[in-house]
Amino acid sequence: YEISACLVGSEMCIRDSTLSEPGYDMMIGDKTLINCLLEPIDASVGLLSWSTTNDRVATVDADGLVTAVGAGEAEIIAQDPLSGLSASIAVKVVGEGVVSLSLSYVRNQDELKALGWGFGQTPASVNFDAEGMTVNMSLQSNSKYRADLKMASNDRPVVLNIGTYRYLAFRMDVPGNGSLKLDTNKGDYGNNPTGVLAEDSQVIYYDLQAKPYFPTDAPSDKLTTFQLKIADVTVQPYSYKVYWVRTFKTLEDLKVYVEKENNK
């Protein structure tokens, strides 16, 4: 919308605002900063009042940072308190059939275990920081290093909806060599990922439809084995760092997500 510029005391009304949707379905635990273009250009996002129509689905803070807290749909509203005019976007949060975890929000192995995640072999050490999780792998009896990343357990099984969310992506610093094998109790996806994102070499992804393990027209069975086997490492670094793990509908959605993450 367009309205005339106005001054109230020393405060300026915003005469135009445009909010950009995330560009992908959000998942529980996701955080995204809504891109807001304002006119006049010297107007500040701090002038806006933010709200949500459903705080059980998504919350929003004073800077326009949206946090997905539950499955469903919500509308995020940015309003200029002086003029009363507003702009809004729709946000969809998916609860089942997906995988989503930012390791920057995990502080220790107890929290990781509470999420149903863990390791196939006991690592030499695991360190958490504001960016993610660094795993120092353990030496095996074959004189090679290994530490599989487990993303499911008997207590916290995984259900996949690969008909809709086809791609599983990891942002990670991989070890010096060895193999990366995505494995489930239905079968594995080979020794290497489907591809590496051209726009960001730290992002590897798997096409979950590449093997006929799961239906594409219905959710999968509950998986208690869902892991990335990281093995046979013989050159340094004997470690890997994971920033986030997530499923996506399309590679374009993945690219949009990566661009937003890189521009934080």
Residue positions per predicted region:
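Extracellular/luminal low-complexity segments enriched in Ser/Thr/Pro
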Residues: 62-74
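Surface-exposed loop/turn motifs at beta-strand-loop junctions within extracellular Ig-like
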Residues: 40, 80-82, 232-234
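Short, small-residue-biased leader/transition segments that mark boundaries at the very start
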Residues: 1-14
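C-terminal edge beta-strand
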Residues: 10-11, 86-95
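Solvent-exposed, low-complexity, repeat-rich "mucin-like" stalks and linkers
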Residues: 17-45
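A short beta-strand micro-motif common to beta-rich folds, especially ectodomain repeats
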Residues: 72-84
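Beta-rich carbohydrate-recognition modules and glycan-binding surfaces
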Residues: 95-264
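Short, solvent-exposed loop/linker segments at beta-strand-coil boundaries, enriched for Pro/Gly
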Residues: 42, 47-60
